[in-house]
A protein has these predicted regions:
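Beta-propeller-forming repeat regions
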Residues: 1-148
């Protein structure tokens, strides 16, 4: 089926009862609410585009009062001929205060995960210390201290 067109794979009746949708963007991005019912689209840095994003957490990582982004992803569930989405190892993006985001090197951020992340969740312990839990597909979650 790899060399066939979509018209050769499906009969006309399938198309007649199908809902057609169009994607305007194929990159990882944020939509910024302008407050008047409109949104401004902003692509995320190129390092984020290396793999899919499956989990995002908004936290002020560096204590400057602006929400930064922590992201993780990967998808290993594709058929072998399509390969895996596994080129990123998690992303930390620091907010410059004007919604400009700068990617942080893994050594600087301390956030490096080769696994297939399905969800990110931040939480505090009873003393108020912040942590990030990464839910890993078919594995134990990983927990990172955010205040160290």
């Amino acid at each position: 089926y790899a060399r066939k067109s979509i018209d050769e794979l499906f009969p006309k009746e399938v198309f007649d009862r199908s809902i057609m949708k169009e994607a305007a963007y194929s990159e990882s991005l944020i939509a910024i609410n302008e407050g008047d019912g409109s949104f401004r689209i902003q692509a995320l840095p190129s390092r984020v585009q290396l793999s899919c994003v499956c989990g995002i957490s908004c936290e002020d990582i560096n204590g400057d009062g602006y929400l930064d982004l922590i992201m993780g992803g990967h998808n290993f569930e594709y058929k072998p001929q399509f390969s895996r989405l596994d080129a990123g190892y998690g992303n930390v993006l620091l907010n410059d205060g004007d919604l400009g985001f700068t990617w942080q090197d893994y050594k600087q951020s301390g956030f490096f995960i080769r696994d297939e992340i399905k969800h990110l969740k931040s939480f505090k312990d009873k003393s108020g210390k912040r942590f990030l839990m990464a839910a890993i597909n078919d594995n134990k979650p990983k927990i990172y201290a955010l205040d160290e």
